[in-house]
Amino acid sequence: SYPAHGKEVSEILGKADIAMYQAKKQGKNQYKLFDSALEQRVQKAIYIEGKLQQAITLKQFELYFQPKINIRSGQVESLEALIRWPNNGRMIFPDEFIPIAEDKGLIGKITECVLEMACDTLSQWNGLVHLKGLSIAINISGKDISVDNFYEKLERLLSRYKFNPSLLEL
């Protein structure tokens, strides 16, 4: 509304468009009022979308490992790989970029990055006595498994990196 959301017609229409887009994302028969928080979320999503392809190409993602501990023995049985994206001095967490990657059809490429990083890690651990035999679990989307060449790509990774394939949990 004038003047709260702008003094120029183009500025007001741009903000109305942002609100309309968000209402459409929520489903049919919805409405959304524009506010500055909405604008910040949209700008952040646009920023992430713009940087995501570059992050995939340059392999800017990192894996962090969360231990899975056997309650009875207190021993670490395996690790869960958690993807993180360091960007300009801050961490972009999966809940911020995974939905955008899925929406833009990039989730398969991210899964490939995670698989390769996990395989590389397991290969490096293969020679370390205290880490040998420790498995890594990764979360993958059902969409990834249904892609025709998923298993071929997985087989190529397993043949390239030398480790016991049973140590990779999908």
Predicted regions, residues:
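Active-site catalytic microenvironments for nucleophilic, acid-base chemistry
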Residues: 22, 84, 100, 117, ...
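Active-site core of bacterial EAL-family cyclic-dinucleotide phosphodiesterase domains
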Residues: 33, 44-100, 137-139
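Cyclic-dinucleotide signaling modules
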Residues: 1-46, 50
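Conserved long alpha-helical elements within nucleotide-processing catalytic cores of c-di-GMP signaling
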Residues: 17, 21, 95-99, 108
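Catalytic strand-loop-helix junctions within cyclic-nucleotide turnover domains
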Residues: 1-12, 37-41, 68-73, 85-89, ...
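Catalytic core of bacterial c-di-GMP phosphodiesterases, primarily the EAL and HD-GYP domains
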Residues: 12, 31, 41, 71-80, ...
